[in-house]
């Protein structure tokens, strides 16, 4: 459920099916992954806080029973920490039954946040981050223009868990293709094991 007139398609994880979708950004700041068509038609932009506040206010008036909010689009953690804290607080203030806020977060965006920033976001009520590992094989990550490395992904995942977040990771099983199936499977398992 959402109240929004912004351009582009809305995407969310399956587990956020009954969440209020709050599009704090439009599109994806990276948006070069060859396997992902989700935000190709949207030019990335961060919405002004006043606009986001208005969406939260309209959403709370229309859906006062909301228990979960999902901050969209492709990588909400690209926002300044103080802006995210404001958004999370406003959600908890206006949705009295709210139990959890979640967001997509790229490994790079998680890694850019300090441990203190991540802890503050979690303490404010951001409970789950959805991140795309895709592959643990650097050759595959380079080929698909993911914009990260296995090392950075491990570091980001460890930082998120240390801050107290639940971490939901996406892995694309066939991304290695026939030529890198073994390396893709092996290195992806290593990354997941190293994170947790």
Where are these regions (language model features)?
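Auxiliary Fe-S-binding modules of radical SAM enzymes
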Residues: 1-17, 95, 190-194
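Canonical Radical SAM [4Fe-4S] cluster-binding loop centered on the CxxxCxxC motif
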Residues: 9-51
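Conserved, mostly hydrophobic/aromatic
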Residues: 28, 36, 52, 71, ...
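Active-site mouth loops of central-metabolism enzymes
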Residues: 43-49, 104-111, 176-183
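Short microdomains enriched in Cys/His and/or Lys/Arg
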Residues: 48-65
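Short, acidic/polar
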Residues: 52-56, 112-120, 183-191
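Conserved SAM/AdoMet-binding glycine-rich loop
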Residues: 60-162
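Conserved C-terminal portion of the radical SAM core fold
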Residues: 128, 151-196
